[in-house]
Every structure is written in C-alpha cells, then in structure tokens.
C-alpha cells in the first residue's frame, strides 16, 4: 500500500480506479508575421468563439451547481475581454508583429505569474483561471480539438492541475474523485468539485506518478490522503471513518435553525465571511446569522476599471436580499498590501503591507469611494446593512467618512433615490494603534470588528506566511487576547458591540475564551458555522470563579 498526502477540498471518501489525465501541451513558436492584420483577425475570431463557449458553459453550470458557481465562467468572459489583457495581445500582434498564439501565450503567462506571486492564496489560485482562458483561446487559434479523457466507471481523476472548464465538461456520473499534483483549495476548480459533492484533494506533489494508472485506490477527503492499493485493515478503518463522519455531518445539519447559545444561556452571534456570490450561497446554506464581512475589493480584480455604481448596487442588493433581513456587514474597499488590482493604478511601495491601504486608500480616492458609498446606500433599502471601514487607526478617519456620507445622502435625496436611515458604520480594529485608541474610536463607531489576521502580523512583527509563524506567534498569545479584551471592554463601555472576523474566530478551541472575553460576534468561513455552533452549545460559563481563573492563565 502507498499513501500520498495532499490538502483536502471536500470531506468525503471515494473508492475507485486511478485515471490519469494529460491535457495536450501547445507547441508555441515565436514568429514575426508578414500580415499582422490577418493574424489579429485570427485572434478576434478565436476570442468570439471562446466567449460563445463560455456562455454555454455558464448555462450548463447554472443547471448543475447553481447561479453562484456558474459565475466562474462569467469571470472567464470578463478576463478575455479585460482591457489590459486584450490590449497586451493586440500590441504584440499589431505593433510587434508576433503570431497570435505567441501573443496569447506570452500575455497569459505574464498575468498568471503576477497572480502566482501574490501573498493571498485566493489571488494565487486565480492563475489557474488565466491558464484556462489561455488554453481556450489557443485551441481556437491553432484549431485543436478539446480532448477530455475517456473515463472508465468509478474513476479517480489524477492530473497536474484541473481547469474549471474541464471539471464542468467531464462525465460526473463516472467520477468518484479528483486528485491533483498542484492546485489550491481556493481555486475555482476546487469550489466546483466541492459543490458538485465530489471528494477531492490537491497539492499531492510529484509522488502521484503515471505508473499507478488503473490501480485501485481510496481518496480520503477528510485527511487529504490518497491510498493506492490499500490493505484490508486500511479499508476497514476508512469505512468506519466514513460512517463516523457521516453521522457527524447529520448531527451538524440538525443544528440548523438552533441558537448559538451556551448551556447556561450566554448567546453569541455567528456570521459568515464571504468574498463572492458562491460564498453567499454557502452562507445561506450553512445557516449564517448574518454576514460579518463581505470583502468588496475582490470585485475589482480582472477589470480595467473599478466596478461602476450600478454593478455594485446590484451586488450589494443581492447579498442583502439573500440574507432576508439578517445583518449584512459590507466592508469598503480594502485595497493595498497583497490586494492591489490593476485598476487601482498604485505606484510601487517599499512595504505595501504598511502602505496606502484600507480606509487610507479610500480617502485618497474620494470619487471612487463616494461611488461605493452611493451604491451601498442605494442598496440599503433591501435589508439590514452595516458598513465596515478597514484599517482604521484614528477617529478622524471615521469623522471624514461621516462627512462624505452626508454628501452622498444629499445627492441621493436630490435625485429622488431612497435609502435606509438605520445604516450602521463600523471600524475594523486591526492595528495596535486602533486597539490603544479604541475607547476614542468607539465614540464615533456603531460597532467594532476585530481583524485578527492583520492585528497578529502587526503585533508580532511577523508575516503570517512565514514558516515559523505558528511557532513564534501562538493563536492564544497573551498580547493578542489582551488586545481583544481591551477592544471589547471599550466597545461595551460606549454601548456598541465587538466581533472577531479573523481566522482564529473559527477555532473551536478558543470559543470558550472568546465568550469569557465578552466577544459579541464571531464571523467565519461558511463551512465553520455549524461546527462553531456545536462548540458554543457544549460550553457552560456558570462558574464565574472558574472563568476568571481560566482568563488569568491567558491574560
């Protein structure tokens, strides 16, 4: 028996035969052409054909996985028509006289490399989308057929990486699981596999060799392990694990509609962090009490310009309507650090993590910011909207935003547009400066969200991507817990609520501590909502002496 470890995408177990898929690699030659106009027409024809195909894929995906996941192919259409992407290809053909296939391949490679070098795993995973779009264009330019593997029954598809379009087009009835040598759990392919209910693991590395073609295997989507020719003992263990995990899922499902309340009556809100419409659907499906952070900056990628007011309005309206009266906290653009879209047109900074980001960026680009505020206030009539300002370090920033909101409201009234009068304005507390002045900020903010991801980095002077991060900066470090307590105390002293929307919010080993610190809300990825509810409902805080002693161990 051989076992290979990777990263789990979807928790389930699949048994089948390994089927290796190798997509044809294009042979691209760099050629100077004599008729660039003819070559450009070839590219335009390929682009138009690709857009039609993507429209068909969208329709197919919408029927099988829903509107949210089908948006993957809308994003691919947007990339093909992206002004910067299209302009680069056009320049290489018409001005530099290169062949169309080279122009597409070299431009796509540059875009993919740029994304792969970003710190954000989410943005790194978008490199696969660029490659998928590039392959689609090249197939049309070179007149190559789209070849998918001929699948046997009960196939576990093994490949280097899988493109979203390939995932969508394969015969799912014959597929038991996916296993890739590279890839990310945040890729569109991983999201599709998860929502199709297909067990998958990614990033297993080069140990996954073609020599295992046709071998019996079991894919453990819980631990992220592929077992090739497993022995009887391992099979029995995996069967038992599947039964146990299935029972756990069933019990978690029963928690839908229940309160997030401890055994002795302490209640805490559990909200969802989302980036896009797929995660919005997942938040609803997992019974989120609200949206704790909708990150709007991700709307700005793969675009020649910032989203216009109407696009934003419909996006925010959709989120508010989907949550059906529950609170939706929408963050204003958190541009900067590892999230710098091309449309931001920002000059290079020596240390972008500590540069013009968050609310600083918004206040420097007031016209862009006011467009976002207008869209938010227009959407506010469709639900319970709260607006969150990222990277606030001083109360003066909130005061300036309030001045802009007064201007925006006056404009909307003049235009005869409606907006809600109960929109809350909150501050993201994610720097030591904001923590230490949270008593002052609380006098102007309607609520606090503690962004522990950045707060940890700035407190410990250590990048979260650093390999020694977990060893040097434990999640229950006294400094971090003291900061959380200070923010909560200052919030409550001023009659407002304080929540946590960083990664540690979803850690059930810290849930009891957060309750003892008087945290009002935890906002997590949608898949963590029900496990966190289970953790809350198993806790009892009745003994104040014990709670005080527990806190002393940390504070």
Task: Enumerate the predicted regions with their spans.
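Alpha-helix initiation and N-capping motif
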Residues: 40, 47, 51, 69-73, ...
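Intrinsically disordered or highly flexible coil/loop and linker segments, enriched in small
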Residues: 52, 56-63, 67, 85, ...
